[in-house]
């Protein structure tokens, strides 16, 4: 946390608001559905339904850590092939459960993240 605070303090010198761009990347690539990632030649493992609440909570924990470090805002990145984007896009979300299919269903994971 001290190193993050030092980064945040550098932003304090100017008049710009401090924010952190949040992305969660793990060692094992996971996605909305199993298959090759459209943005790289990586094969991703589709997240199981029971894993989704913990993943959404991880976003929430990251936001709390950023707040503790003194950031004013957090960007939830939901584009360009990142995890939330994979749930939103019919090209990467081939799920057959309540997280796939209609736009409302594909938005369900993003809604979980925002609630955290």
Predicted regions and their residues:
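An active-site metal/cofactor-coordinating segment within enzyme catalytic domains
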Residues: 14, 85, 97
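Non-cysteine beta-strand/loop elements that form the S-adenosyl-L-methionine
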Residues: 76-77, 85-89
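Alpha-helix-loop-beta-strand connector modules within alpha/beta enzyme cores
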Residues: 1, 88-116
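Non-globular sequence segments
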Residues: 1-65, 69
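Hydrophobic faces of well-ordered beta-strands that scaffold small-molecule active sites
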Residues: 1-2, 74-76
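Glycine-rich beta-alpha junction loops
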Residues: 4-7, 78-82
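A structural motif corresponding to the C-terminal end of an alpha-helix
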Residues: 65-72, 112-116
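Conserved active-site and cofactor/substrate-binding residues in soluble primary-metabolism enzymes
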Residues: 47-50, 54-57, 82, 105-112
């Amino acid at each position: 946390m001290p190193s993050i605070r030092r980064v945040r303090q550098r932003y304090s010198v100017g008049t710009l608001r401090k924010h952190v761009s949040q992305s969660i990347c793990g060692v094992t690539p996971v996605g909305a559905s199993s298959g090759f990632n459209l943005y790289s030649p990586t094969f991703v493992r589709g997240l199981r339904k029971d894993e989704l609440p913990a993943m959404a909570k991880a976003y929430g924990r990251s936001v709390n850590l950023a707040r503790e470090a003194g950031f004013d805002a957090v960007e939830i990145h939901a584009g360009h092939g990142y995890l939330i984007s994979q749930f939103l896009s019919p090209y990467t979300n081939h799920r057959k459960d309540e997280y796939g299919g209609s736009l409302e269903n594909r938005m369900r994971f993003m809604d979980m993240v925002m609630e955290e």
